[in-house]
Design a protein with these regions (language model features):
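Catalytic domains of carbohydrate-active enzymes, especially glycoside hydrolases
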Residues: 51-80, 182-185
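Polysaccharide-binding and catalytic clefts of secreted carbohydrate-active enzymes
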Residues: 68-69, 105-108, 117, 140-240
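Aromatic- and glycine-enriched glycan-recognition loops and surfaces
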Residues: 45-66, 93-117, 223-234
């Protein structure tokens, strides 16, 4: 055992420098859902706004001290966002009310504070899930389920964007374009870009019959996810 450890140690020592990564990503998520990481204070008063900002700064200071260099800041949750958007409403975690304006731009603030500390800030966006019926109802007429019913489907008491509908990739690209064009983000991080777990009865039969082009259901669904990634990647690269 000692000999093996010694040999491994020597191998690491003689590996060429070029084998080392040029940039090691040491990333952490800052989760806004239910205020799991942030925020704990509601931004309903000047004092509340200041406290909410201080909470985020404290997290960033701790990450910097722990030698992290990348922050994945939750920018979209489930059909709502943490920046002033012309497409979707503010998440209720900021003020206690869906669509409530916190009086500042959380994403812009997060980017500025990350860059002050020499850290990258990536926009972390939950993509396909839209939340349960209660959550969707709380968003009112600004919910995508009300504005663009064709690309949304209910499944097991929740709503989802339909990956098999061509309009879904267009809608997600619109959101990503809003973020990439309006903010100095260092990257975009997609979450839940997939079908729900154990979803043999996911209601996409109509789209499958229309768009499958001879593929099996499983292959068609896999291709739908790949196409969304491909489409948005190309769109972002065309911008930056």
């Amino acid at each position: 055992m000692r000999l093996s450890i010694l040999i491994l140690s020597l191998l690491f020592l003689i590996l060429p420098a070029k084998a080392q990564p040029k940039h090691e990503v040491r990333a952490a998520w800052i989760t806004a859902v239910y205020g799991l990481d942030w925020p704990r204070t509601r931004a309903t008063t000047p004092q509340g706004i200041r406290k909410q900002k201080e909470e985020l700064v404290d997290i960033l200071d701790k990450l910097k001290a722990a030698n992290f260099n990348t922050v994945l800041f939750q920018t979209r949750t489930r059909g709502d966002v943490l920046y002033p958007s012309s497409i979707e409403p503010f998440n209720s975690i900021l003020t206690g009310k869906s669509g409530g304006n916190p009086g500042y731009d959380p994403l812009a603030f997060a980017i500025e504070e990350c860059h002050k500390r020499g850290m990258e800030c990536h926009a972390w966006m939950v993509t396909i899930p839209l939340g349960n019926r209660k959550h969707v109802a709380s968003l009112g007429n600004r919910s995508v389920t009300k504005r663009m019913k064709d690309i949304c489907v209910p499944y097991k008491n929740e709503y989802f964007l339909n990956p098999g509908h061509p309009g879904t990739k267009e809608y997600l690209m619109k959101l990503v374009r809003e973020v990439v064009s309006g903010y100095d983000v260092d990257g975009v991080h997609f979450d839940y870009l997939r079908y729900p777990e154990n979803a043999p009865l996911f209601p996409d039969k109509y789209d499958f019959r229309r768009y499958n082009k001879g593929r099996t259901l499983d292959q068609w669904r896999r291709d739908n996810i790949s196409e969304i990634v491909r489409y948005i990647y190309k769109g972002v690269k065309a911008m930056k």
